[in-house]
């Protein structure tokens, strides 16, 4: 069945979301049109505002509507000498949800991937190097993902940071709390044994 052009455009637009295929997009569109037009209009307004007004913090590169994000402008955290390097703004939210890190962040917005044309320039490493050269950074925590690309990115940044006499650490990888060993993959188990701590 052929839909109206506007409905078809809505369905096709919803498909840009991760994990949303044609059927899911169609269900979402029908839900908004049949049962919740008010929420649909609110979604459209929020989406339009976010797309036009949300940019990147000039210091850490996370999402913000201002020049600097709330963490970078915080009196307690904006002057912290510890920077945690992450791949995405979603990683910042995940770490913040834990409530244990009290320093600043630097968001790469990806990882090194020469085959995809992603090099140091695309990750904003010149800005990170300026932070390191300022003398205000005592420790750099590398919290890139434990993937081949994430590890390569962490090693590249560590080499860069060593030139500035900054302490470098890498977040631990291993068995998750509440996890059962029989379900943990061999690579994660090896990392857990290699990174074990004395009691």
UniProtKB/Swiss-Prot annotation:
One of its GO terms (molecular function) is zinc ion binding. The keyword Ribonucleoprotein does not apply. The keyword Ribosomal protein does not apply. PROSITE patterns: TOPRIM (PS50880). SMART domains: TOPRIM. May play a role in DNA repair. It seems to be involved in an RecBC-independent recombinational process of DNA repair. It may act with RecF and RecO. Residues 81-176 form the Toprim domain. NCBIfam families: recR (TIGR00615). A zinc finger (C4-type) spans 57-72. This is Recombination protein RecR. It holds the Pfam family RecR_C. Keywords: DNA damage, DNA recombination, DNA repair, Metal-binding, Zinc, Zinc-finger. It comes from Shewanella baltica (strain OS155 / ATCC BAA-1091). SUPFAM superfamilies: Recombination protein RecR. The gene is recR. Belongs to the RecR family. GO terms for biological process: DNA recombination; DNA repair.
